[in-house]
């Protein structure tokens, strides 16, 4: 009778998302309305500002170059980034987003803290994988993580100190902040690296919290042609409702309007590779498959069934490069057709 946790789960299950796409209106009209609502929920856009872009270091690493830089995404807030650029003709850009880890250096396969090696062995050296797959790689440090916010042992502030919660008091969300940084990073790379990087065909990818930001950024920005979120796309009622997750996963009010599979339909005019681990305890396979089926139905309606892929890895909460990258590479070009 007095089980409040069970009650909120039941309430979630019986709440039909009010903006679910039902096919009764043109897809483009629904997408416009849905994106406007999602933008409101994420508290976007933020106020524009000068990018104050600055190169911090530049290195020739043989087959590729590395440019470390930062830029201003909001007045007085700077975003650290690294851009890895293969030699030769401009390659498609892959945006690589770390989840709850010690920072973006993991994407380059660099060990700085205890436990980093385990993260890298879990397939999280995204930038190096992207280079091998034929992309340029942009690494963006997530707010409240790594050099943008961590403890002495490298632990992200959003997980240990709930540092992302004050954003809610200002009507903001951590996801919205991170999405904004990704969108502004695309602006910066498109402006200053246009001759060295192909930004007409952008892929965005990440695992766990990085997958979540990949997902929402791809919902919001059509410049991202292929989204590859890993261990993050799963119906809310099967993941962040019944199980404990970091506060940075939550967007106030979102479940009244959308489930995660509904939001995935915002990408049904582009391409989506959902990656999951069949033994992932945080994002159970059943909930992942619900999201996938809902999204794929709209992709099919749009004549793009082949542009919505579910990659099932054989283990738990990690990335699966051998299974995922071949699908992403195919869709990087399919997304343009």
Feature annotation, model-predicted:
Residues 195-208:
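Alpha/beta-hydrolase fold nucleophile elbow
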Residues 97-180, 191-192, 239-241:
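Cap/lid segment of the alpha/beta-hydrolase catalytic domain
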Residues 206-216:
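Glycine-rich nucleophile elbow surrounding the catalytic serine of serine-hydrolase chemistry
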Residues 1-65, 337:
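N-terminal targeting or regulatory segments adjacent to alpha/beta-hydrolase or S9 domains
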Residues 76-79, 86-93, 100-103:
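Proline/glycine-enriched tight loop/beta-turn segments at coil->beta junctions
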Residues 267, 274-276:
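Short beta-strand/loop motif that positions the catalytic acidic residue
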């Amino acid at each position: 009778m007095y089980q409040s946790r069970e009650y909120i789960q039941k309430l979630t299950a019986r709440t039909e998302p009010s903006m679910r796409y039902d096919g009764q209106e043109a897809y483009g009209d629904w997408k416009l309305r849905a994106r406007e609502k999602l933008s409101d929920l994420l508290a976007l856009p933020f106020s524009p500002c000068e990018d104050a872009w600055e190169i911090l270091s530049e290195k020739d690493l043989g087959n590729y170059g590395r440019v470390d830089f930062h830029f201003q995404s909001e007045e007085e807030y700077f975003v650290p980034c690294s851009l890895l650029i293969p030699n030769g003709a401009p390659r498609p850009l892959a945006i690589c987003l770390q989840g709850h880890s010690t920072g973006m250096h993991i994407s380059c396969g660099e060990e700085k803290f205890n436990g980093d090696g385990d993260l890298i062995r879990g397939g999280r050296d995204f930038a190096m994988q992207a280079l091998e797959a034929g992309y340029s790689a942009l690494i963006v440090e997530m707010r409240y993580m790594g050099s943008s916010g961590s403890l002495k042992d490298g632990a992200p502030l959003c997980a240990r100190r709930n540092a992302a919660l004050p954003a809610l008091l200002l009507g903001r969300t951590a996801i919205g902040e991170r999405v904004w940084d990704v969108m502004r990073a695309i602006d910066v790379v498109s402006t200053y690296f246009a001759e060295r990087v192909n930004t007409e065909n952008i892929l965005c990818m990440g695992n766990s919290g990085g997958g979540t930001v990949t997902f929402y950024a791809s919902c919001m920005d059509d410049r991202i042609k292929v989204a590859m979120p890993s261990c993050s796309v799963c119906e809310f009622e099967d993941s962040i409702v019944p199980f404990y997750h970091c506060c940075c996963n939550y967007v106030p009010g979102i479940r009244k309007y959308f489930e995660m599979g509904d939001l995935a339909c915002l990408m049904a005019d582009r391409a989506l590779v959902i990656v999951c681990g069949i033994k992932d305890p945080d994002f159970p396979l059943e909930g992942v498959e619900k999201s996938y089926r809902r999204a794929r139905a709209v992709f099919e309606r749009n004549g793009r069934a082949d542009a919505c892929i579910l990659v099932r890895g054989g283990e738990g909460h990690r990335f699966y490069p051998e299974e995922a990258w071949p699908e992403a590479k195919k869709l990087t070009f399919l997304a343009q057709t």
